[in-house]
Amino acid sequence: SEMCIRDRFGRKHVFNTEQEDHSWIPTEGKITFPSTKKHGWHDYVDSRRLEITCGEAPFLVSRYDAATGAILPISQRIGLLDRKLRIVDEHTEDDLMWWKWTLRAFQSVYGYEFQGDSLLIARANLLLTFVDHYHNRFGTDPDKNHLKQIANVIVWNLWQMDGLTETIPFRKPPEQKVEFDMLDMLTMLDEPNSQDVPAFVRLYDWRAKTSLSYSQLLKGAKQ
């Protein structure tokens, strides 16, 4: 939001200026950052962002006009990941550094969605966003190795989940047992129904290089 941008940068209209008709005009020139500690461009790119019930992930990437479906020029895109990629493009001259921080930008954004078809579109939107930015930078399409690395991040960071239970949809959430009796012991010997086994979501912390649960990710983000 504009308030978050103002808190981080100490000024308004860093990326774009909204018009009365709710359209926007992107700012021109290289975006500068405050000199205060942990407010540099590296910190901005690494800052984690989560879009809940993300649908097609319009807050992460804005590849197209939601009303018309027309593809937007890169300069007109204002999604959270779009902004990070703009910063990377403006602040890196070396191609290897561009790739390093582009990858980190993708590693920093997360989203979950209940509906599988919407999730598929969201993942495609992020992957195509990478293709767009790569082509804009180098004038050619990315090779298979770069695509595989970005795709691996996307399938980890955008996942299917029921936000109420924090489990895979249609899986039964675990019940809180107060007592444990003989009947419980007998039922434990039965083959469980796969639909009754809770499946908690596992994510990946790319900086710590470890897998963790969704609740652990939220706890770490609040610290």
What name fits each language-model region?
Residues 10, 17-21, 40, 92, ...:
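Serine/threonine-rich low-complexity intrinsically disordered regions
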Residues 2-5:
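Short, small-residue-biased leader/transition segments that mark boundaries at the very start
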Residues 17-166:
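Conserved S-adenosyl-L-methionine
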Residues 8-13, 117:
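Primarily extracytoplasmic ectodomains and periplasmic/lumenal surface modules that are beta-strand-rich
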Residues 44-65, 109-119, 158-167, 173-209, ...:
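Conserved proline-anchored active-site loop of SAM-dependent methyltransferases
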Residues 12-13, 166-168:
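Feature captures the FAD/FMN-dependent oxidoreductase FAD-binding
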Residues 7, 124, 128, 216:
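Charged/polar, solvent-exposed surface patches and flexible loops
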